[in-house]
Amino acid sequence: GIRLPENFFSPYQSTNLVEFWRRWHITLSRFLRDYLYIPLGGNKKGEIRRNINLLLTMVIGGIWHGAGWTFVVWGGVHGLWLAATHHFGKYFEAVPRCNLKVVGGLLTFWFVVSAWVLFRSPDIATAVNYLQNMYAQPEWLAVGHPGIFKDRLIGVMVALILVCYYLPNTQQLFGDHHPSIPSAQLCPEERTAKVNLVWRPTIKWAGLVMILLLTCILSL
């Protein structure tokens, strides 16, 4: 059959933004690295030049998604956070890795989700309004507010977070069958699933897939 390159590899499990871009839109990030970042000088000409190269690369990557100021700012904030990750990372080498994973994962998730507001908004003013409602005046935190925090939705969100963070992705689930061309950007540790679950052509798996399919159809 046809094997395509990996393009997304559980990006929301990333513990920092550098790792996020190794996992997110792998073909695009590889293109930006090989044809923009490295030709600009990469990290070979000092920290300041590296940070400038990162910022330029991410801004151009933002414009690639669309010709609007929201995409420019989205790329810019990603470039700045990447530069900060490289700069401050050396100061945390003595911190236990397990602690870095927890704190880094939460910070990365918060930043990426906040930045998506810029990506999805039609203009800067709308993005600022959304962010103000999220952080400056978060009415959704009010007790009894009829927003997203209903009892049933809280359970669904917690379940989905656990699924996204702990269960293997499709490449890991079907890894024995080599469904895609592995990316060299990911290290072995990043490829290891937290839960060892592998698909097999068995009656049990067929039944599970049928249950999931029926659940999806009935939820339409």
Language-model region placement:
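Soluble catalytic regions of membrane-associated enzymes that act on cell-envelope
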Residues: 8
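Non-catalytic, membrane-anchoring transmembrane segments at the edges
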Residues: 2, 14-33, 37-220
